[in-house]
């Protein structure tokens, strides 16, 4: 594939993603908090700091991996980096493979660091890149963490995608052992299982982003790029973010879990944190805001999102993220069926 074709693919991904609509209903609607009428705290008591063994984020939301590798996507990364700088959010760039192949593309990613020199930035590579390239991806952005995306359904629907996955787990293990910053194993919208969590724990992984279905749908994106658009029947493949978080419950004391995939509102973010996530990522909401409404409007959107999270936490009498994990939740019969059939232990305080 030529560099021009790769740039074209990056642009197609963004165009199709922006055209996708948010789901009217999701599994976040199938879980409810129990309301208690009189909080014992005030809004000003709320601490939204997200703390993991290696990373401290001012807020438990971040701009998740999206793009880079073309002139248009450079402009997107530039604007998102300004939003991150002005709001204090962490930001992940999209796959840096284009820059690792072609130095001319590096600035489509490094613009994020240029615009946000003091901010927290995650670099991003695939599970098949050599260790040396993973190290290079971290150095490229002076990144505080490295996402490794695992996207086998996307690759298999992508006309020119990868068809070989046998070496992925061993390669991830090699990268984790060599890279000095936290390595986050990130799904791309298909969710994670307890079996995967076991395998990742065995090779020393300390961070995951479950990225469940419900947000940007890469099966649909790649199917749109197929000549016959003949794999639409896979549109609903995978676990939702709620199901994925429940799958991680037994591993949350050893692995820091981030949540993304289909988060629409501050309440969805709070529900993710209550299920054990340390932070929550969003992609398309930020992309649509910054492209359709500009930087200032997107900054205001983030600030409002944060204030709404504080209001919800006050209603829940939760001063911090850890308090949220002790709050009472009622699940729908459908979610309870998943929990029972998958033999998940979700005992809560």
Curated annotation (Swiss-Prot):
It catalyses: isopentenyl diphosphate = dimethylallyl diphosphate. Its main location: cytoplasm. It is found in: Cytoplasm. The keyword Mitochondrion does not apply. InterPro entries: Aldolase_TIM (IPR013785), FMN-dep_DH (IPR000262), IPdP_isomerase (IPR011179). Coiled coil: none annotated. GO terms for biological process: isoprenoid biosynthetic process. FMN binds at residues 65-67, 95, 124, 186, 211, 216, 262-264, 283-284. Mg(2+) binds at residue 155. Substrate binds at residues 9-10, 95-97, 154. Its EC number is 5.3.3.2. One of its GO terms (molecular function) is oxidoreductase activity. SUPFAM superfamilies: FMN-linked oxidoreductases (SSF51395). Its cofactor is FMN; NADPH; Mg(2+). One of its GO terms (cellular component) is cytoplasm. Signal peptide: none annotated. Keywords: Cytoplasm, Flavoprotein, FMN, Isomerase, Isoprene biosynthesis, Magnesium, Metal-binding, NADP. Involved in the biosynthesis of isoprenoids. Catalyzes the 1,3-allylic rearrangement of the homoallylic substrate isopentenyl (IPP) to its allylic isomer, dimethylallyl diphosphate (DMAPP). Homooctamer. Dimer of tetramers. Belongs to the IPP isomerase type 2 family. This is Isopentenyl-diphosphate delta-isomerase. The gene is fni.
